[in-house]
UniProtKB/Swiss-Prot annotation:
Summary of the function given for this chain in its UniProt record: Located at the top of the head of the 30S subunit, it contacts several helices of the 16S rRNA. In the 70S ribosome it contacts the 23S rRNA (bridge B1a) and protein L5 of the 50S subunit (bridge B1b), connecting the 2 subunits; these bridges are implicated in subunit movement. Contacts the tRNAs in the A and P-sites.
Residues covered by region (Disordered): 94-118
Organism listed in the record: Haemophilus influenzae (strain PittEE)
Membrane spanning stretches: none
Gene that specifies this protein: rpsM
Family as reported in the entry's similarity comment: Belongs to the universal ribosomal protein uS13 family.
Domain of life: Bacteria
Protein name: Small ribosomal subunit protein uS13
UniProt keywords, alphabetically: Ribonucleoprotein, Ribosomal protein, RNA-binding, rRNA-binding, tRNA-binding
Length: 118
């Protein structure tokens, strides 16, 4: 297994799909990384030489991924909470942040229903 950005990349998958195992890299970004590294998208990871894997590592290293990205997202949410702005309040109350309706939906964000005690 190739190790890129601290993650073991699956050998049996195509390069584009295998790179999406890294947090912060989706299909579009993985296609751009493969193109920049000069690697065909349909080549499997186990078929790549060590030089090609090093090129992939260099290209992935140009982006914020994995732990750094998770930390950045967490700090962004913490900043909103500290500011006390509307979005921060919505995060604090575990409600949808981006203007979705909450009268009927938003069960995922609000959690299971709480029965009303009489």
């Amino acid at each position: 297994m190739a190790r890129i950005a601290g993650i073991n990349i699956p050998d049996h998958k195509h390069a584009v799909i295998a790179l999406t195992a890294i947090y912060g890299i989706g299909k579009t970004r993985s296609q751009a990384i493969c193109a920049a590294a000069g690697i065909a998208e349909d080549v499997k990871i186990r078929e790549l030489s060590e030089e090609q894997i090093d090129k992939l590592r260099d290209e992935v290293g140009k982006f914020t991924v994995e732990g750094d990205l998770r930390r950045e997202v967490t700090l962004n949410i913490k900043r909103l909470l500290d500011l006390g702005c509307y979005r921060g309040l919505r995060h604090r109350r575990s409600l949808p942040v981006r203007g979705q309706r909450t009268k009927t939906n938003a069960r995922t964000r609000k959690g299971p229903r709480k029965p009303i005690k009489k």
